[in-house]
Amino acid sequence: MASSSLETSFSLTSVSELFKTDFKSYQQAVYNEDIILWSQLEKRPYTGKEQDFPKPFDYSGGVSSGSLPKKKAAGYEKIKFSSIKMYAMADVEREAVALSMSDKGAFVRLMEEPMKKIRESFAWNMERALHGTSDGKLGTIATSGVTDNGGGNYTLTLSTPVIANFEEGMFCNIETGNTDLFEITAVDPDLSTITVQRESGATQVPAQTDEIFMQQSEDNDPYGLADMNSKTSGNAYNVSTALRKWHSSQLNLSSKSITPQIFTQHLLRHEKRVGKKKGFNFCMFGYTQMEKLMNQLEDSKAYDCIKLGAKDKALAHVSWDAVVIHTPNAGSITAIANRFVPDSEVWFMNTDECAIYEAPKSGFVTEDTGTPLLRSQDEDKFEIRWAWYGQAYFPPISLGRIYGGSVT
């Protein structure tokens, strides 16, 4: 019998009210959560107005053979730095908290999820800052790198970007000194572009070569590795980097490919300059440089694979896959690929000499209510705030980098 256009079958569409939706468990996040550098640094207490301590820079003069020598006092420099403030915040409606108190009401309890996400956001932002240029900069717009999509929406091509600095949903400022807010709505790692939406009422128009900053962070970040391991002039922690025993060790590859020989050369030259055996104990590769070096080491098997644990006791359950690269004379060094390191670079450090200084009250703000939920005075909602006070200590003499490597 021929079917009629008036007929219907029992189907998902015609009787959809009879069917249930099988809600699955809350899914794994699909974005960068690595906190490699933070995990490898010792946490030291920060108290007082600023940190101030002496650092010896040479021997006490007065040695000789055969007769009494002339004498000279040892040379010292004063290390000084002040704390900075970093925050992560979110608002939660009180009604939403109440309606999500059980598994029947929601996938996750809103007492827990925002706190988890805030801690997650803070960890990412801290990792970004620790690898950064000390001034809050995320990147720079390339020449002819602005496409106006209309309505305050722009697609920006980035100049030699560190894509890990950009995440959808984060807010940024564009151009030095400008405070208009833009939301990052899309990130394309393959094309090195981001799409941003300007906040309502703002007037800033992005232009080529403009610098992009994390919101309200221009010149407010802690000291970062990209700054300290590339300094060739000026001061670092109140000490001139012109001093031989204070500036970092650097090697420009001038677009050549990294090789085991170059890697070993950099380690040995730093050791020779500093005068300490195994001056570095840890290095982080841009992904392209790690790929190039491992391709050459594969045949010789001059490395071991290990699980790199965290020095931070709070992260004792966290580990990353790393390799220990064996080199003549310079010994072995732990190496790991890191998204926050530019593709053309390799960064070196002695983690025993570096540290994070943080105030005891850093963390969730709980003084007002005894919980992380801070009551809003004018609205039926709570604010959750994570506050961190402190500074990063990266003495340049304990740092190094190989830069300008081939990325093709």
Language model features with spans:
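N-terminal amphipathic/basic membrane-interacting segments and domains
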Residues: 61-62, 71
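Glycine-rich loop at the start of a catalytic domain that most often binds anionic cofactors/ligands
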Residues: 67
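Core alpha/beta structural scaffold of self-assembling particle/tube/pore-forming proteins
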Residues: 1-59, 75-408
